[in-house]
Amino acid sequence: MSLAPEGRRLLRVEARNAEVPVERKPEWIKAKVHMGPEYIGLKNKVKSAGLHTVCEEAGCPNIFECWEDREATFLIGGDICTRRCDFCDITSGKPRPLDMEEPQKVAENIREMDLRYATVTGVARDDQKDGAAWLYAETIRRIHALNPGTGVEILPPDFGAVPELVQQVFDARPEVFAHNLETVPRIFKRIRPAFTYEKSLRVLTMAKADGLVTKSNLILGMGEEDHEIDQALVDLHESGCDIITITQYVRPSKLHHPIDRWVKPQEFVQWSQRAEEIGFQGVMAGPLVRSSYRAGKLYAQAMQRLGRTLPENLAHLAGEKTARQEASAVVAQMS
């Protein structure tokens, strides 16, 4: 009998995945390290204060660039998800009780780090009657109260697309409401069995109708075809999605979905151009782009294109900022 690293019996899908060897990464997937003074100062502060971010704990390759601009990502709701997606490295199972003090703790972490923009994501909590909607909403409220100069991007699960649950999060007024579609209809059930393509789009439509700036992500390299990517982009835009990030799937372990292909940087440039043509207000595509990468920059760009003025307390997010992982920049580095 095959066992997972934590000692449990392998799921059938994991056993099937494990039959495919882990793929070797191409040269363009390897990130170059650029450690500036802001990054070094922030890292020292995080270490001395015992703070926790997804950026460090997930080993994100973009931490140097994001921290240099004082942006970071936090995970709430615990570290065990009630759903299992075939690309995701978060453990699935029965989670521990919610930490009701977590919203305040996250807000205090952000204050200690003096962040300009924070992305807050989290696990699905289907064990909770409200899907932990209160936790997401309260975290937004506490961050805003304690850090008026920090933009907040919330990246929750779909809450089953139940209007009264998602409305709790909308009412907390994050700067950006993000929900990641991730893949195309044909392989959606295999990749995200506890979600549906339609509900993910519906959540974005509801957020847009409530006046929020909306955002989503597509992961390439999991078996999708070009025409399916194009249709997913159209579907997202028609559902009210303002900002799109397009990324390369990188397999966390042999138990996860095998990589179908490594998408070349030049192709990401083409998808970025296509997303602009479709009408997205903010686009970021590249092999090492992640959904929270340069999130403050994309929010400011979308606000400008939507004809909205940045709030005075967030005016510092405007202006040109680097994006070393953006596809055209990667292509330029390769030449």
From Swiss-Prot:
Record-listed [4Fe-4S] cluster 2 binding positions: 81, 85, 88
For the protein in the UniProt heading, the enzyme class is transferase
Compartments, as annotated in UniProt: Cytoplasm
Q: Give the pathway.
A: Protein modification; protein lipoylation via endogenous pathway; protein N(6)-(lipoyl)lysine from octanoyl-[acyl-carrier-protein]: step 2/2
Q: Where on the tree of life does the source sit, at the highest rank?
A: Bacteria
Q: Explain how, and how many, cofactor molecules are bound.
A: Binds 2 [4Fe-4S] clusters per subunit. One cluster is coordinated with 3 cysteines and an exchangeable S-adenosyl-L-methionine.
Enzyme Commission number: 2.8.1.8
Domain Radical SAM core, residue spans: 67-281
Q: Which cofactor does the UniProt annotation name?
A: [4Fe-4S] cluster
Q: Which reaction does it catalyse?
A: [[Fe-S] cluster scaffold protein carrying a second [4Fe-4S](2+) cluster] + N(6)-octanoyl-L-lysyl-[protein] + 2 oxidized [2Fe-2S]-[ferredoxin] + 2 S-adenosyl-L-methionine + 4 H(+) = [[Fe-S] cluster scaffold protein] + N(6)-[(R)-dihydrolipoyl]-L-lysyl-[protein] + 4 Fe(3+) + 2 hydrogen sulfide + 2 5'-deoxyadenosine + 2 L-methionine + 2 reduced [2Fe-2S]-[ferredoxin]
Q: Keyword Iron-sulfur, does the record have it?
A: yes
Q: Which residues bind [4Fe-4S] cluster 1?
A: 55, 60, 66, 292
SUPFAM superfamilies registered for this protein in UniProt: Radical SAM enzymes (SSF102114)
List the SMART domains. Answer: Elp3 (SM00729)
NCBIfam families xref list: lipA (TIGR00510), PRK05481.1 (NF004019), PRK12928.1 (NF009544)
Q: What is this protein called?
A: Lipoyl synthase
| Native source organism of the sequence | Micrococcus luteus (strain ATCC 4698 / DSM 20030 / JCM 1464 / CCM 169 / CCUG 5858 / IAM 1056 / NBRC 3333 / NCIMB 9278 / NCTC 2665 / VKM Ac-2230)
Q: Lineage of the source organism?
A: Bacteria, Bacillati, Actinomycetota, Actinomycetes, Micrococcales
